[in-house]
Swiss-Prot record:
Originating gene: PGAP6
Induction (UniProt): Repressed during activation of CD4+ and CD8+ T-lymphocytes.
Name listed for the protein in its UniProt record: Post-GPI attachment to proteins factor 6
Disulfide linkage: C498-C508, C502-C521, C523-C532
Keyword terms of this UniProt record: Cell membrane, Disulfide bond, EGF-like domain, Glycoprotein, Hydrolase, Lipid metabolism, Lysosome, Membrane, Signal, Transmembrane, Transmembrane helix
Superkingdom, taxonomy of origin: Eukaryota
Organism name: Homo sapiens (Human)
Biased composition (Basic and acidic residues): 334-343
Stretches that traverse the bilayer: 546-566, 569-589, 606-626, 630-650, 654-674, 691-711, 718-738
GO cellular component: extracellular exosome; lysosomal membrane; plasma membrane
């Protein structure tokens, strides 16, 4: 069967030597353990695929993983993945292990956080490998997959889960981890085609023989048989057959070893995948010097479908347009040829086809329903089958939801409706087994009874293929009770981007990798999981309201600097503080998830105004402390605010958006204070009370607030630490505002309007002079 192996290397085979390494891989023959030898190189060709590297992120949700999509050609016999990882050299770079997930047909369903999935969700663990980065800044790993399934293969890579710490962009040193996968495909070009019921002679030497057989629609069974086996190196028939492809994470590839097996050697495959080529590899087990001769025969058992008549429906809906799965309406001439060339099942019918309408509603959003828009009739003689076409290549990025509901009046205590959901081919063996297993796929079972008339199934990221829903009526206690029984089942079949739109505590986001689109949920308020349904760390409604009140009411602390500014006639500064208080309050009221939400404007507008107000408040406070000339101060107020607005438009979360203007304002303030100290030959401000009761407490509050804002905030304590930041910022502004200008002396010159008299103070004598 297919193997997946890993290997790690050091700096000598790092990303910088990826080109020479791939040339060596191209020149080297496949390993002998995979069943290949140098003589088989004549019939094998190699192809190389690569994608641009991407910077990895620490995992917090599915959007943190970097997704790569590769197209594997048909007749591939070996995949060699070269996984290259590199990092920057610096103190910020630590040892880490990159996790790489693989899946065939759809993006891998991963769960690094160990969260729970919604009820009725079918999840298969992903196949993954780890690439450590410890002593060297570069590392690589290789993964081999023999006999891979053709079509789309997806690779997802990510760093370990994040620490949930909120860091300012540009403040803390960062480390870039870069990942690049490359794919080397070995495919066979010399392959023999097996025709149904026609023996195909084969002679095996030291290299394997590659065969393939086409399985058309409505094939119930495929029988592979080895006949007339002759070997000169051992007794019996030393041949190993490998049938079918490898699909990670699950693998149902069949391996038949005929040594010592009953003669003739046979392999029966129920419900093989329809409408595709099935690859068969024959290998000799006698060693390099022995030969084995045999004849391979493929026998197909045709399935006669009973089709639901839809002509009256089509005639009554001529003005409507449907995209129907017409392949399920009636047997085509090809199906009749299959019956003549293969074997026809003796029963009159093996399944009942129900035509299905596919309605494309939006991106990764499809609605399936029976063409007659009524329920499906389920009986006991044959399965009722519905085909869901999810083979466009763009349908694997959502979630397939299936909901069944049985008619209450028709369900009796002794009857059970059994359903199976399978890809590639329907499950038809309800009379012999209920495990929903076809030749190369483990299906998903559902059941309806008188006690449970509803059944649901959710398949995240379904594989690109035709999916089939099979239903049949069963009577476990007495089969005769089901002979005349009929149950109508209502089906609700959807492909949705996100289940329930991620609920009230999540947001469904559409992600893109080149032209491929897929969806995922981003959760809030402590909710986690695939659809934001895991409440193990969730906040209660009371906690959400308390958090909202903390973040909004803490802005009332800005009333203190507003009052101080008005009292000291700093009206422009008071206006800036009022603006900051207003938009910070309503931004945080809109930023909350769940029920405690209030948005008076769009979220983006509120966020921009909040960031602008915060930067402008710090800017005007520092400039006000500089005690500039009135005209110059207001000019700098305006210019600084315009610069902050421009920088926020360029990068809203950049650290230098606020730090740059604030440092410039601090330089102006320090220069003015130094000038006054030199001019007056004493410390400025001159009053020790000003230093002790205003400046030092204000600077201390601002320093503590900056420390909390830059180094202590996490996703868990954000509501408390950010509220403290609001209080400290507003309190420091109230303390740092300078006192008003000194009032005019009684004898200072003042202009009397409108009489145009000027009263002046005489420095030599206390007399008034009227001019």
């Amino acid at each position: 069967m297919g193997r997946a192996g890993t290997g790690t290397g050091g700096e000598a085979v790092a990303a910088v030597v990826a080109g020479p390494l791939l040339l060596l891989l191209l020149a080297r023959p496949p390993p002998a353990s995979a069943g290949y030898s140098g003589k088989s190189e004549v019939g094998l060709v190699s192809e190389h695929f690569s994608q641009a590297p991407q910077r990895l992120s620490f995992y917090s949700w599915y959007g943190s993983a970097r997704l790569f999509r590769f197209r594997v050609p048909p007749d591939a016999v070996l995949l060699r993945w070269l996984l290259q990882v590199s990092r920057e050299s610096g103190a910020a770079c630590t040892d880490a292990e990159i996790t790489v997930h693989f899946r065939s047909g759809a993006p891998p369903v991963i769960n690094p956080l160990g969260t729970s999935f919604p009820d009725d969700t079918a999840v298969q663990p992903s196949f993954q490998v780890g690439v450590p980065l410890s002593t060297t800044p570069r590392s690589n790993a290789s993964v081999n997959v023999s006999h891979p399934a053709p079509g789309d293969w997806f690779v997802a890579a990510h760093l370990p889960p994040s620490s949930q710490k909120i860091e300012l962009k540009g403040l803390a040193p960062t480390c870039a981890y870069v990942f690049q996968p490359e794919l080397l495909v070995t495919r066979v070009v010399e392959i023999s085609i097996m025709e149904p019921d026609v023996p195909l002679p084969q002679t095996l030497l030291s290299h394997p023989s590659y065969l393939k057989v086409f399985v058309p629609d409505y094939t119930r069974e495929l029988l592979l048989e080895l006949r007339d086996c002759v070997s000169n190196g051992s007794l019996g028939c030393p041949v190993r057959l490998t049938v079918g492809p490898v699909t990670l994470p699950s693998n149902f590839q069949k391996v038949l070893t005929c040594t010592g097996a009953p003669w003739p050697c046979r392999l029966l495959l129920p419900s093989p995948p329809w409408d595709r080529w099935l690859q068969v590899t024959a290998e000799s087990l006698v060693g390099p010097l022995g030969t084995v001769a045999f004849s391979a025969v493929a026998a197909l058992t045709a399935c006669r479908p009973r089709s639901v008549t839809i002509q009256p429906l089509l005639q009554s809906s001529q003005n409507q347009s449907f995209n129907a799965s017409s392949g399920l309406l009636s047997p085509s001439p090809d199906h009749q040829d299959l019956g003549r060339s293969g074997r026809v099942d003796r029963s009159p019918f093996c399944l009942t086809n129900y035509p299905v309408t596919r309605e494309d509603m939006d991106v990764v959003s499809v609605h399936f329903q029976p063409l007659d828009r009524v329920s499906v009739r389920v009986c006991s003689d044959t399965p009722s089958v519905m085909r869901l076409r999810l083979n466009t290549g763009m349908d694997s990025g959502g979630s397939l939801t299936i909901s069944l509901r049985a008619n209450k009046t028709e369900m009796r205590n002794e009857t059970v409706v059994v359903a199976c959901v399978n890809a590639a081919s329907p499950f038809l063996g309800f009379n012999t087994s209920l495990n929903c297993t076809t030749a190369f796929f483990q299906g998903y079972p559902l059941s309806l009874s008188a006690w449970s008339r509803r059944a649901n199934l959710i398949i995240p990221y379904p594989e690109t293929d035709n999916w089939y829903l099979s239903l049949q009526l069963m009577c476990p206690e007495n089969a005769e009770d089901c002979e005349q029984a009929v149950v109508h089942v209502e089906t609700t079949l959807y492909l949705v981007p996100c289940l329930n739109d991620c609920g009230p505590y999540g947001q469904c986001l559409l992600l893109r990798r080149h032209s491929y689109l897929y969806a995922s949920c981003s959760c809030k308020a402590g909710w986690r999981g695939w659809s934001c349904t895991d409440n193990s760390t969730a906040q209660t409604v009371a906690q959400q309201r308390a958090a909202t009140l903390l973040l909004t009411l803490s802005n009332l602390m800005f009333l203190a600097p507003i009052a101080v500014s008005v009292r000291r006639f700093f009206l422009v500064e008071a206006s800036v503080y009022a603006y900051t208080m207003f938009f910070s309050t309503f931004y945080h009221a809109c930023d909350q998830p769940g029920e405690a939400v209030l948005c008076i404007l769009s979220y983006d507008t509120l966020q921009y105004c909040d960031f602008l107000g915060s930067g402008a408040a710090i800017w005007v406070t520092i400039l006000c402390m500089a005690r500039l000339k009135t005209v110059l101060k207001y000019v700098l107020f305006l210019l600084g605010t315009l610069v902050i607005a421009m920088s926020l438009q360029l990068d809203r979360r950049g650290m230098w958006n606020m730090l740059g203007p604030c440092l410039f304002a601090f330089v102006i303030m320090a220069s003015m204070w130094a000038y006054r100290c030199g001019h007056r030959r004493q410390c400025y401000p001159t009053s020790w009370q000003r230093w002790a009761f205003y400046l030092l407490p204000g600077v201390s509050m601002a320093s503590v607030g900056i420390a909390i804002y830059t180094s202590m905030m996490t996703s868990d304590n954000y509501y408390y630490t950010h509220s403290i930041w609001h209080i400290l910022l507003a309190g420091s502004a109230a303390l740092l505002l300078p006192p008003p200008d000194q009032p005019a002396e009684p004898w200072a010159c003042s202009q009397k309007f409108p009489c145009h008299y000027q009263i002046c103070k005489n420095d030599r004598e206390e007399l008034y002079a009227v001019t």
